[in-house]
């Protein structure tokens, strides 16, 4: 290898991560590893380590007990007929769309859908009709909008072969009435896919109770797993199609390209699962804590957007006050990031002051009190500087 390249490689040998005491990042709160998962990460970190006793199908490996986890534990946890491990929620969505829809079909999705819903549909050759949100400040989705969107597309001669609901959405943390959406979709003859990337592993989600036909979840977002990893569950009538086997490679499932996560991601998910199951049972505590935190910030003039009272730990805030302070602050629009970092707080993206999102998930009340105090100090400091 040329010396011009090898001379640059030392930086890759021992990479470190800088993180503050309190991390508010919604992407990361639900994916923080348990001590058991960190131990599994070391034990099973080698590539293909899970395949010591594999007979050709990842989900049928018995040592470690992958088969039991995938075919017994996860279906009971999600309350769904059949489950597989994927590389993430997006891969699960694509597998479902590609197998259940035909190129040129339409899907109906909520207007708050994650960008990966759009990309999965595009990759599968599908068009999208949106159920628009209500706009500022709540950005809610009306379940009846699904009926309108399905019928509008059908009236134009298009086949609607799937509906997608983001539960909750990744911007505002809104939880739509999923059971009502499912009821409407089924009345119109359309299966519903529930994107639970921010719910499965944080809060109770029963596919059967919600009557969702397909559910996808994210291990690295919400199941205390190292990424990338996700789960894909389906009712039997759809599972038979999504998880169909190859005609030529009889023990390989086509949509999953045979085997998916073959090492650390899967074993960290399994090692964390007892903790994940326990924390799901304490979900109401997390909701109460999020509502308290929102009310405290609103007293400082930082306004929570989305549903109120809020029903999820992910929240979106707007603050004209912080934005005005940023105009004269020495570090400009990056001032909030640095002020919080100086106080041991991270997770709000650098450069954001006027609007930002955060999560209170699994953060102790006393740490959230520190965050509230930090915002109070920052606003007071900015006001004094402006007065001078």
Curated annotation (Swiss-Prot):
Residues that the record marks as modified (N6-(pyridoxal phosphate)lysine) are 221
Similarity section: Belongs to the SepCysS family.
What NCBIfam families has UniProt attached to this entry? PRK09331.1, SepCysS
Residues making up the signal peptide according to the UniProt record = none
Q: Which cofactor does it need?
A: pyridoxal 5'-phosphate
Known catalytic reactions: O-phospho-L-seryl-tRNA(Cys) + hydrogen sulfide + H(+) = L-cysteinyl-tRNA(Cys) + phosphate
Entry keywords, A to Z:
Protein biosynthesis, Pyridoxal phosphate, Transferase
Query: EC class of this enzyme?
Result: transferase
Family matches, as InterPro entries: Orn_Lys_Arg_decarboxylase-I, PyrdxlP-dep_Trfase, PyrdxlP-dep_Trfase_major, PyrdxlP-dep_Trfase_small, Sep_Cys-tRNA_synth_arc, SepSecS/SepCysS
Q: State its role.
A: Converts O-phospho-L-seryl-tRNA(Cys) (Sep-tRNA(Cys)) to L-cysteinyl-tRNA(Cys) (Cys-tRNA(Cys)).
> Subunit structure of this entry?
Homodimer. Interacts with SepRS.
Q: Which residues bind pyridoxal 5'-phosphate?
A: 89-90, 195, 218-220
Keyword Protein biosynthesis (UniProt) = yes
**GO MF annotation list:** Sep-tRNA:Cys-tRNA synthase activity
Any idea of its EC number?
A: 2.5.1.73
GO-annotated biological processes:
translation
Enumerate the Pfam families for this protein. SepSecS
- Protein name per the record: O-phospho-L-seryl-tRNA:Cys-tRNA synthase
């Amino acid at each position: 290898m040329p010396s011009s390249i090898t001379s640059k490689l030392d930086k890759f040998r021992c990479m470190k991560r800088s993180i503050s005491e309190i991390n508010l990042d919604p992407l990361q709160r639900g994916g923080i590893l348990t001590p058991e998962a960190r131990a599994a990460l070391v034990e099973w970190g080698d590539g293909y380590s899970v395949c010591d006793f594999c007979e050709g199908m990842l989900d049928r490996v018995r040592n470690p007990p992958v088969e039991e986890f995938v075919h017994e534990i996860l279906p009971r946890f999600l309350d769904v007929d059949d489950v597989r491990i994927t590389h993430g929620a997006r891969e699960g969505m694509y597998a479902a769309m590609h197998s259940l829809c035909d190129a040129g079909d339409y899907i109906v999705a909520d207007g708050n859908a994650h960008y990966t819903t759009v990309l999965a549909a595009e990759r599968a050759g599908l068009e999208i009709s949106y159920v628009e949100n209500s706009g500022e400040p709540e950005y809610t989705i009306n379940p009846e909008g699904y009926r309108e969107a399905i019928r509008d597309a059908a009236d134009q001669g298009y086949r609607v072969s799937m509906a997608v609901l983001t539960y909750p959405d990744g911007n505002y943390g809104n939880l739509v009435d999923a059971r009502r959406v499912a009821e409407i979709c089924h009345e119109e003859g359309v299966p519903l896919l529930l994107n639970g990337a921010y719910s499965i592993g944080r809060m109770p989600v029963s596919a059967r109770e919600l009557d969702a036909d397909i559910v996808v979840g994210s291990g690295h977002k919400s199941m205390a797993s190292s990424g990338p990893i996700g789960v894909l569950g389906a009712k039997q009538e759809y599972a038979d199609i999504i998880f169909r086997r190859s005609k030529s490679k009889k023990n390989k499932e086509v949509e999953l390209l045979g085997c998916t996560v073959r090492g650390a991601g899967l074993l960290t998910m399994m090692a964390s699962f007892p903790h994940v199951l326990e924390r799901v049972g304490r979900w109401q505590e997390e909701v109460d804590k999020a509502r308290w935190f929102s009310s405290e910030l609103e007293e400082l003039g930082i306004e929570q957007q989305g549903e109120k009272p809020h029903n999820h730990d992910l929240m979106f805030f707007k603050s004209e006050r912080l934005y005005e302070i940023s105009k004269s602050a020495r570090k400009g629009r990056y001032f909030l990031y640095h002020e919080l970092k100086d106080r041991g707080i991270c997770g709000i993206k650098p450069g954001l002051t006027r609007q930002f999102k955060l999560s209170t998930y699994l953060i102790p009340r006393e740490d959230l009190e520190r965050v509230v105090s930090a915002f109070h100090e920052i606003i007071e400091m900015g006001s004094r500087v402006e007065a001078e």
